[in-house]
Amino acid sequence: MPAKLGYWKLRGLAQPVRLFLEYLGEEYEEHLYGRDDREKWMSEKFNMGLDLPNLPYYIDDKCKLTQSVAIMRYIADKHGMLGTTPEERARISMIEGAAMDLRIGFGRVCYNPKFEEVKEEYVKELPKTLKMWSDFLGDRHYLTGSSVSHVDFMLYETLDSIRYLAPHCLDEFPKLKEFKSRIEALPKIKAYMESKRFIKWPLNGWAASFGAGDAPPS
């Protein structure tokens, strides 16, 4: 029986989970809640056996999880992809935290009612953060070495989202551009992105000042 992944019908926090599942070839069913489905979700939220009800949720047989990082860690652990030593596991946790910091920083700008005002400062400071990631990646193909892990999809998704706000943000960082292209070229990811199941837009919830709406900026 396939696992179930529930989230809003947008990219948001579920997109790295989707990408990771697709990369692994895991069979799963998506339960998507549209813009007008808030009442539907609220009617189901506390009746699904979730310990801490929220979106995204992931139900795999008896395992019922919420929180996107916890979901990805569970899936990674099932596939033996969480490291083999305390040092490796701690390093992966560190990357998760930094990737979430990047995502949260992007989200704060996108959901700010004064978006146009805060955007300028965000774009101005962005190169410092991107340089940190570029330096960390170095000559490796992926964040933990030569193999793909869930943290790669966490970073990829935020980088891809940021480019809608700052289209040329990666021009100074060829290693990050190559990393992004490398993820998109993975056969199963490429096939997913070309499928009807792939959600390109919106990036954020419908209350966002940026990344919502019916179509991406031209």
Swiss-Prot record:
Major subcellular location class: cytoplasm
Superkingdom field: Eukaryota
Reactions this protein catalyses: RX + glutathione = an S-substituted glutathione + a halide anion + H(+)
EC number(s) from the headed UniProt entry: 2.5.1.18
Keyword field: Cytoplasm, Transferase
Positions that bind substrate: 111
Molecular-function annotations in GO: glutathione transferase activity
Subunit structure: Homodimer.
Name under which the protein is recorded: Glutathione S-transferase class-mu 26 kDa isozyme 47
